[in-house]
Amino acid sequence: MLSLSKNWNTLIKPNRVTYENFPETNNKAKIIVEPLERGFGLTLGNAMRRVLLSSLQGAAITSIKIPAIEHEFSSIPGVQEDVSEVILNIKGIEVKMHVSEKRIMKLKATGPCVVTAGMIDTGHDVEILNPNHVICNLAKNKQLEMELTCKVGKGYVLSTNSYEDNLPIGEIAIDALFNPVKSVTYKVENTRVGQVTDYDKLIIFVETNGDVLPEMAVGLAARILQEQLQLFIAFEEQEEDKQVKTDSLPFSPYLLKRVDELELSVRSANCLKNDNIIYIGDLVKRTESDMLRTPNFGRKSLNEIKEILAKFNLRFGMDVPDWPPENIQELSKRYEDSYN
């Protein structure tokens, strides 16, 4: 019976994740994942984007209370904007909460001034992430007082679906955008593994409001997907005793890996091929001097291969007992799960 694990173990697995922050801010990042099986870039990119934009926890202002104002179709004495405009501006305030319980913030201002989010008294548990965001314009000798309720949630919640069905008189519910991720885009490019050049490279661009860093947001999205997909694994995996298999060889099974599966430059790969170096075991038995005598093989190619071998605690000039084995092709196929 075909081993179930071959369904996923034979697929190439991503082994590089690179995070690149933009110099002007820590809230934007480019995340590069490679290599992926062809088609997996689009599959994972779309899934990650949808989760990032819909499912992460964040904080937002959910309601406001202004003295003598009972609904949004009113005007505030001394304030240039009407209540609807003020609410629209308040929806743009980005907040970060350090507790899970709701908090009430207070705003007091005396005109003439431009009232900004930075004027809100948040206390110790809430942080305003865009303090220069304009709320309204206040006329001379006029005062504005306001209470703002802040909560933790996820997604986008309409004021008509407020968490509290029975708000006190004078408290106005507003639409709340809890998601800390502001934008997500992705693209898929080709990447090279050995001599194969059409594997996928997934590049994700993420911007957050500062509540979480982009790399943390991506990690949370991946964890959410993992949790949701776990239920679909409705079979018991067969435990394979890889240790027994490995111990039956007098050398590391990694030496059975073909050199054309390494991420070598075209020049280096061609030199090895022309010199009939097929497996890593063939390669590590050569000394550095042997390699430099190979036609068209220079110091740059030597350093490239040394760097790759070092990742697996291998080097040139190794003594490999019983190499090459008589049934090397059969062994290479049998032990491929051990080195993939």
UniProtKB/Swiss-Prot annotation:
BP GO terms, sorted: DNA-templated transcription
Known catalytic reactions: RNA(n) + a ribonucleoside 5'-triphosphate = RNA(n+1) + diphosphate
Name of the gene: rpoA
A GO cellular component annotation in the UniProt record: cytoplasm
Region spans: Alpha C-terminal domain (alpha-CTD): 251-340
Region described as Alpha N-terminal domain (alpha-NTD): 1-236
Assembly description: Homodimer. The RNAP catalytic core consists of 2 alpha, 1 beta, 1 beta' and 1 omega subunit. When a sigma factor is associated with the core the holoenzyme is formed, which can initiate transcription.
Pfam families assigned to the protein according to its UniProt record, in alphabetical order: RNA_pol_A_bac, RNA_pol_A_CTD, RNA_pol_L
Name under which the protein is recorded: DNA-directed RNA polymerase subunit alpha
MF (Gene Ontology): DNA binding; DNA-directed RNA polymerase activity; protein dimerization activity
Enzyme Commission number(s) from the entry: 2.7.7.6
Function of the molecule: DNA-dependent RNA polymerase catalyzes the transcription of DNA into RNA using the four ribonucleoside triphosphates as substrates.
Source taxonomy: Bacteria, Pseudomonadati, Pseudomonadota, Alphaproteobacteria, Rickettsiales
Keyword field: DNA-directed RNA polymerase, Nucleotidyltransferase, Transcription, Transferase
Broad class of enzyme this protein falls into: transferase
Alphabetical list of HAMAP family matching this protein: RNApol_bact_RpoA
